[in-house]
Amino acid sequence: MSPVASTRWCPTPEQLMILEEMYRSGIRTPNAVQIQQITAHLAFYGRIEGKNVFYWFQNHKARDRQKLRKKLAKQLHQQQHQLQLQLQQIKPKPISSMISQPVNKNIIDHHNPYHHHHHNHHHNHHRPYDHMSFDCCSHPSPMCLPHQGTGVGEAPSKVMNEYYCTKSGAEEILMQKSITGPNSSYGRDWMMMMDMGPRPSYPSSSSSPISCCNMMMSSPKIPLKTLELFPISSINSKQDSTKL
């Protein structure tokens, strides 16, 4: 019994070189006519059938797809690795270190107008009279020093002493103005400044009024005295007369 001949195709080097050249030229899936022509041409270099040509092109396309898939996977892996390196370089600081750092209030006030406004409003809320500290020094307005008191024998007409400090030439004039009327709501006793003492001299070139506050701050301290406009003895005599 003769041995069965092997049906496995063993291409020769010339056949493989011709097939690879055809594949590089652009032939990927040859039709039936092309397969017959290629088989007839390769039969000069060895045994070959039409199915061998068909399967060679199919296997060669599969190998190329596998190589392309591996190449794309490798490129994707490299891109992910580079992205991780970039993220590590720009990694933000931990939250604990940011909390431990002191906050500069001046920077916050400069960059946040709302915080600046709120801070000023809060500051003015606790000190509402700071803006009135030097009003008398900035304007030549009258200055009153009342001392309200309550007691028996309060006069029906109230007296308000207003002091004006003006300047005419090189001399200063202290004027006192008395205002009476039912609309005034002051008490019976008033704090008055006595013995004003020597007042400082100013150059005669300026003709604008100078406030009392500036003059008082530049002059030595002046003692204050309380005058009894309504002595107690007169009040007692009035009470005795009413009893009679």
Curated annotation (Swiss-Prot):
DNA-binding region: 4-68
This protein's GO CC annotations: nucleus
Entry-linked SMART domains: HOX
Keyword set, alphabetical order: Developmental protein, Differentiation, DNA-binding, Flowering, Homeobox, Nucleus, Transcription, Transcription regulation
GO MF terms, alphabetically ordered: DNA binding; DNA-binding transcription factor activity
Annotated signal sequence range: none
InterPro entries: HD, Homeodomain-like_sf, WUSCHEL-like
Organ and tissue specificity: Expressed in aerial parts of seedlings, inflorescences and flowers at low level. Expressed in a restricted number of L1 cells at the lateral regions of flower primordia.
GO term, biological process aspect, one: stipule development
PROSITE patterns reported in the protein's UniProt record: HOMEOBOX_2 (PS50071)
Name of one Pfam family that matches: Homeodomain
Protein localization: Nucleus
Function: Probable transcription factor required to initiate organ founder cells in a lateral domain of shoot meristems. Involved in the lateral sepal axis-dependent development of flowers, probably by regulating the proliferation of L1 cells at the lateral region of flower primordia. Required for the formation of the margin cells of the first and second whorl organs.
UniProt similarity note: Belongs to the WUS homeobox family.
Alphabetized PANTHER family for the sequence: WUSCHEL-RELATED HOMEOBOX 1-RELATED, WUSCHEL-RELATED HOMEOBOX 3
Name of protein: WUSCHEL-related homeobox 3
Gene designation: WOX3
